[in-house]
């Protein structure tokens, strides 16, 4: 089984914020692949289904971002899922809005959700970095906790990620990125 983790903060007040773009992708994948309704488990909202030929558990930690690692550790430990079979979808202020990059391992670039996951399971999991841009002025935390100006474009990108997710899960990272870029340009 694969573990697909969408990072975000719980609560309606954070629903449309840049920091919750991982939740948007997780919800979109769950809908697009007809996963059952999310249930509370492992300090998270969890749903298990299939993404193409891949059995997958989608996890949305119910803790705040800086404690996401606890939920990931619980789910991964219970199902004996190694870090290499975990993919985390998260906001990245170092990328322009709408840019998507994928990598395995590496540093957390100051992202508290990734820092928490690194401390819990190590850093060899996959990361799908979802660009939210940096503010021209003001604090970064204020920026990522503010709402998107164009939430429709975020939802469109989430659907493109979902539509091409089997490429990524099949190990074709370049094909996945190529399709996202091509689709996103249209």
From Swiss-Prot:
Its EC number is 3.1.1.29. Belongs to the PTH family. This is Peptidyl-tRNA hydrolase. NCBIfam families: pth (TIGR00447). The keyword Cytoplasm applies. The gene is pth. The active site is at residue 19. Monomer.
């Amino acid at each position: 089984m694969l573990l697909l983790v969408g990072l975000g903060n719980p609560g309606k007040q954070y629903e449309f914020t840049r920091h919750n773009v991982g939740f948007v992708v997780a919800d979109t994948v769950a809908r697009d692949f007809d996963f059952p309704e999310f249930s509370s488990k492992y300090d998270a909202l969890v749903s298990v289904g299939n993404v193409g030929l891949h059995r997958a558990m989608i996890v949305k930690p119910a803790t705040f971002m800086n404690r996401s690692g606890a939920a990931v550790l619980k789910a991964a430990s219970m199902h004996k899922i190694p870090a290499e079979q975990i993919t985390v979808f998260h906001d990245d202020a170092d990328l322009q809005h709408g840019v998507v990059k994928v990598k395995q391992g590496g540093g957390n670039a100051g992202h508290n959700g990734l820092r928490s996951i690194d401390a819990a399971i190590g850093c060899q999991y996959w990361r799908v970095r979802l660009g939210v841009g940096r503010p021209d002025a003001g604090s970064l935390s204020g920026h990522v906790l503010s709402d998107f100006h164009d939430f429709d474009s975020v939802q469109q990108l989430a659907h493109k990620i979902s539509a091409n997710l089997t490429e990524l899960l099949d190990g074709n990272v370049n094909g996945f990125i190529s399709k996202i870029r091509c689709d996103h340009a249209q």
